[in-house]
Regions:
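Active-site/catalytic core of tyrosine-dependent DNA strand-transfer enzymes
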Residues: 163
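Acidic helix/loop microenvironments that form the catalytic cleft of cell-wall polysaccharide enzymes
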Residues: 186-190
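Feature responds to low-complexity, polar/acidic, surface-exposed segments characteristic
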Residues: 2-41, 46-99, 106-127, 133-160, ...
Length: 222
């Protein structure tokens, strides 16, 4: 089981985001409905600068997202930048993801697969990804731990409350058959959907901004 640390979240927009969620403004989106649905979220991630394609420009929506890729996306989406050093021997300083792993470890929202390994190329499960993002949004786990997913019994004990919260706020949806498939590797496309729902409208530059009639979350990272 992957150890997940709650850590301290430093976000200027945390209070605003929490208020929006508590007011119930997060729209309930349809269950995952194929390539067109996923592609729109991937394009939004690219437009915001949270996700990039490979050297050929391919976004590979159906490929599992690695641990290194996932923390990189989270850091960009939430504006994390603080470096503090990490103990991982399998994260060379020359690796493209080295700084983001350091940031994620320093922020405290993810730990290694052991005291000295991070396993950057390993995949991450759907329940792990949902918990990481839910904790970063400062949302507390539901005490009832009830979800409407048909395979809720497959959820790990440590994830039930957080998944219930994520589902209640519309951060996660199931598949057309009503299942959540918590142990499945989360794909790049699914990760994009999760992050876009969480951050809503990002404000990444300093100054006065008009959000118009925006409904949902607003994340301030400038």
């Amino acid at each position: 089981m992957m150890n997940l640390w709650k850590g301290t979240v430093r976000r200027v927009g945390a209070t605003l985001l929490a208020c929006v969620l508590l007011l119930g403004l997060l729209p309930q989106l349809p269950r995952q409905a194929g390539a067109a649905y996923t592609d729109s979220y991937l394009q939004q991630m690219v437009d915001w600068g949270f996700m990039r394609g490979d050297i050929s420009g391919n976004l590979r929506p159906d490929n599992p997202i690695s641990r290194a890729e996932f923390v990189t996306v989270i850091n960009r989406a939430l504006g994390y930048e603080k470096l503090g050093g990490d103990p991982f021997q399998d994260v060379p300083d020359s690796a493209w993801y080295a700084e983001d792993v350091d940031i994620a470890y320093t922020e405290g929202y993810i730990s290694g697969t052991s005291k000295t390994t991070f396993s950057p190329d390993s995949s991450i499960t759907r329940e792990e990804a949902a918990i990481i993002l839910t904790r970063n949004l400062m949302l507390q786990p539901d005490t009832g731990e009830n979800t409407s997913f048909t395979d809720s019994r497959e959820l790990s004990e440590w994830s039930r409350g957080y998944i219930a919260t994520a589902a209640r706020y519309g951060l996660v949806n199931g598949y057309p058959d009503g299942s959540f498939r918590p142990k499945n590797q989360i794909t790049r496309g699914e990760a994009a959907i999760l992050v876009v729902k969480a951050v809503g409208t990002p404000v990444q530059t300093a100054g006065v901004h008009s959000l118009g009639s925006t409904w949902g979350n607003v994340t301030i990272t400038s």
